[in-house]
Amino acid sequence: MKWLLLLGLVALSECIIYKVPLVRKKSLRRNLSEHGLLKDFLKKHNRNPASKYFPQTEAPTLIDEQPLENYLDVEYFGTIGIGTPAQDFTVIFDTGSSNLWVPSVYCSSLACTNHNLFNPQDSSTYQSTSGTLSITYGTGSMTGILGYDTVQVGGISDTNQIFGLSETEPGSFLYYAPFDGILGLAYPSISSSGATPVFDNIWDQGLVSQDLFSVYLSADDQSGSVVIFGGIDSSYYTGSLNWVPVSVEGYWQISVDSITMNGEAIACAEGCQAIVDTGTSLLTGPTSPIANIQSDIGASENSDGEMVVSCSAISSLPDIVFTINGVQYPLPPSAYILQSQGSCTSGFQGMDVPTESGELWILGDVFIRQYFTVFDRANNQVGLAPVA
């Protein structure tokens, strides 16, 4: 009996998963708007989120282009700890990038005065390097140094993790950002500075039993969202997971069969490529078909550059259906029209990302809120199921 109990405990330990709660906060866009800075931000920063996916690197091992407007609408954030003892930071868990960086005490920029700062001298496990990091944000750069330390993620102690410590951060806009830094969860092939991404380091150390992680984004205004490392929790979805092969290993890129409304193709009629990206809030696609979708749902641009929609349209508009690997994934109007403080905006955004296989679509939080998503590195596939 004791042996059976021991075997049961061993089996249970092999299935342990680690959850990082995500909190939903005001986006950077809303913070800037409330402080009367949104128009100035949009004027100074070129609205080109596409450069996130095709960085122009001056030195491939050191520099990455990462336009700040990618994170303008992100609302989901989690807490990690870096160092011994741990220093806490609020980060975006971003499947559309691969690096980890946080502000540091070496940063004198205005943005750093309003965020948590990592102090290497307060960590007994910090190891310095001679490496540097520079990430371009529109009109300025986040520059910093690279170091190694222990990162605490949802109960996991990720030792010897390389990360960036910012020394300068661009403009006054980041002062209002609801996050301190970024934790990238894409493939190592797109990591700047040759840095090993956090999840890869966790897996290489045998800290999780399965080479995958999963994401649930709640529509609730405050809590319930989670990133799960090393496993899948079926309580977050209904039915069974449908698996989609990763078509290009870099971002979490998959093939989409078609996008339809009322049974008619409105985009991607002959198939297209898409990236599943927790670090992009909206659902983006090529400017021409997105313009047609905006017209179909009655969206028009306001003075802040937002595509506004009548809130009453939510009850009458049809679903927009994404067919992926032969399975239909409908988005109801309550998902693709975003309601906030009595006004409504479109969850779609035009963005041209040309590739050899055609223009890319980005399935951001608008899509992920509807579908529990598994990012399976072992089998290079994405799992999707309707949220519970």
Curated annotation (Swiss-Prot):
Reaction catalyzed: Preferential cleavage: hydrophobic, preferably aromatic, residues in P1 and P1' positions. Cleaves 1-Phe-|-Val-2, 4-Gln-|-His-5, 13-Glu-|-Ala-14, 14-Ala-|-Leu-15, 15-Leu-|-Tyr-16, 16-Tyr-|-Leu-17, 23-Gly-|-Phe-24, 24-Phe-|-Phe-25 and 25-Phe-|-Tyr-26 bonds in the B chain of insulin
Residues bearing the modification Phosphoserine: S130
Xref: SUPFAM superfamilies: Acid proteases
Propeptide span(s): 16-62
Protein function: Shows particularly broad specificity; although bonds involving phenylalanine and leucine are preferred, many others are also cleaved to some extent.
Classification via PANTHER family: BETA-SITE APP-CLEAVING ENZYME, ISOFORM A-RELATED, PEPSIN A-3-RELATED
Protein name, UniProt field: Pepsin A
Gene: PGA
